[in-house]
């Protein structure tokens, strides 16, 4: 069938094939984002001894669809003093990098849209671009509250991005590659060969930085829904408002996926007698996402100064010290522990 389509489309075949691969990744991702919102409400409801959404569909399974329809029907109100073009561009710039980063994410040895050697560098670049959507949304709203929220959010994202990047440098040193597939294969050999063990401090710093990077509780001072309402998207409504949350949840899944690939062996089985499978990867991502939800239900929100102090005075020094330690150990007879 594929050969027939290739013959029929001729020179357009590569474009059509890439579009199909993009749809095959973005479609399930949007479904995962929608049901992650339901999982969050259900999990937090369980932790607070209540039921969560349970009215739409069987046990509330259609709640994300109802929420989507509701938001599509709502009007997008643009403030009269706002810059209309930039106001609408903000949500696009927030979600586009969150989706584009998935182009280089491998689900197994062959299931990847673009298997490039600089995959890790590409993902770090894409996650950096998302901050422009935040700044533009706050500035274009022409509201002092939105602009203040945007500045705080941008400062937090940039601060923790440094610590997160340094944490991944340790993985780069151990695997000696920027290709995500090769980094996973370098962890072959079972649970004790994965990088979470020799790079444990970097794994902890990466994961907590990822929580802060995605503006999730207890680092969600930019939104602060129980205190300051909405931060940089205070003036947004309808689908424009929803796109920011789609970007947030897409980024949550992305950083959890990256943690599973970098530190937890990706699709590799934890024991030699069980086969490698994409199901292992999905299980690891789901487990990491559960921690995002657990943190939100458990920890109180940090003050802004505490968040910045943690990033600059704790995480960045810890990652630098551990990178130096890994580099020094690689010059000794114990180098095999880090490869």
From Swiss-Prot:
Chief site of localization: membrane
One of the protein's GO biological processes: aerobic respiration
Membrane topology reported for the UniProt record: Multi-pass membrane protein
> Which transformation does this protein catalyse, written as a reaction?
a quinone + NADH + 5 H(+)(in) = a quinol + NAD(+) + 4 H(+)(out)
Where's it found, cell-wise? Answer: Cell inner membrane
Per UniProt, what is one GO molecular function of this protein? Answer: quinone binding
Keywords carried by this UniProt record: Cell inner membrane, Cell membrane, Membrane, NAD, Quinone, Translocase, Transmembrane, Transmembrane helix, Ubiquinone
* Membrane-traversing stretches: 19-39, 87-107, 120-140, 153-173, 191-211, 253-273, 275-295, 310-330
At the top of the EC hierarchy, this enzyme's class is translocase
Would you say which domain of life the source belongs to?
Bacteria
Q: Which PROSITE patterns match?
A: COMPLEX1_ND1_1, COMPLEX1_ND1_2
Q: What is its EC number?
A: 7.1.1.-
Q: Which InterPro entries match?
A: NADH_UbQ_OxRdtase_su1/FPO, NADH_UbQ_OxRdtase_su1_CS
Q: Which GO terms describe its cellular component?
A: plasma membrane
The record describes its quaternary structure and partners as: NDH-1 is composed of 14 different subunits. Subunits NuoA, H, J, K, L, M, N constitute the membrane sector of the complex.
Function of this protein? NDH-1 shuttles electrons from NADH, via FMN and iron-sulfur (Fe-S) centers, to quinones in the respiratory chain. The immediate electron acceptor for the enzyme in this species is believed to be ubiquinone. Couples the redox reaction to proton translocation (for every two electrons transferred, four hydrogen ions are translocated across the cytoplasmic membrane), and thus conserves the redox energy in a proton gradient. This subunit may bind ubiquinone.
What family does the Swiss-Prot or TrEMBL record give for this protein?
A: Belongs to the complex I subunit 1 family.
Which NCBIfam families is this protein grouped with?
A: PRK06076.1-2
Read off the PANTHER family from this record.
NADH DEHYDROGENASE SUBUNIT 1 (PTHR11432), NADH-UBIQUINONE OXIDOREDUCTASE CHAIN 1 (PTHR11432:SF3)
Q: What is this protein called?
A: NADH-quinone oxidoreductase subunit H
What organism is listed for this UniProt entry? Methylobacillus flagellatus (strain ATCC 51484 / DSM 6875 / VKM B-1610 / KT)
């Amino acid at each position: 069938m594929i050969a027939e389509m290739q013959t029929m489309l001729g020179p357009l075949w590569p474009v059509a094939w890439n579009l199909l691969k993009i749809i095959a990744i973005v479609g399930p991702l949007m479904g995962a984002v929608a049901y992650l919102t339901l999982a969050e409400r259900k999990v937090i409801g369980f932790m607070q001894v209540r039921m969560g959404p349970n009215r739409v569909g069987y046990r509330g399974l259609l709640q994300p669809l109802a929420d989507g329809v509701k938001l599509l029907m709502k009007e997008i109100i643009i403030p009269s003093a706002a810059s209309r073009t930039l106001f609408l561009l903000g949500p696009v710039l927030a979600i586009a990098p969150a989706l584009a980063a998935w182009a280089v994410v491998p689900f197994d040895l062959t299931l990847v849209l673009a298997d490039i050697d600089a995959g890790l560098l590409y993902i770090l670049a894409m996650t950096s671009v998302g901050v422009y959507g935040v700044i533009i949304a706050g500035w274009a709203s022409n509201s002092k509250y939105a602009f203040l929220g945007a500045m705080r959010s941008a400062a937090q994202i940039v601060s923790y991005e440094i610590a997160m990047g340094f944490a991944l440098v340790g993985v780069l040193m151990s695997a000696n590659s920027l290709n995500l597939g090769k980094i996973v294969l370098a962890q072959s050999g079972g649970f004790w060969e994965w990088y979470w063990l020799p790079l444990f401090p970097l794994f902890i710093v990466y994961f907590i930085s990822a929580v802060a990077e995605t503006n999730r509780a207890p680092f969600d001072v930019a939104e602060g829904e129980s205190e300051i309402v909405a931060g940089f998207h205070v003036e947004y409504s309808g689908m424009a408002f929803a796109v920011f949350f789609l970007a947030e949840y897409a980024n949550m899944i992305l950083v959890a996926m990256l943690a599973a690939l970098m530190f937890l062996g990706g699709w590799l089985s934890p024991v030699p007698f069980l086969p490698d499978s994409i199901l292992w990867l999905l299980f690891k991502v789901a487990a990491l996402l559960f921690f995002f939800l657990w943190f939100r239900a458990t920890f109180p929100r940090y003050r802004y100064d505490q968040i910045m102090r943690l990033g600059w005075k704790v995480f960045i020094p810890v990652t630098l010290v551990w990178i130096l330690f890994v580099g020094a150990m690689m010059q000794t007879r114990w180098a095999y522990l880090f490869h």
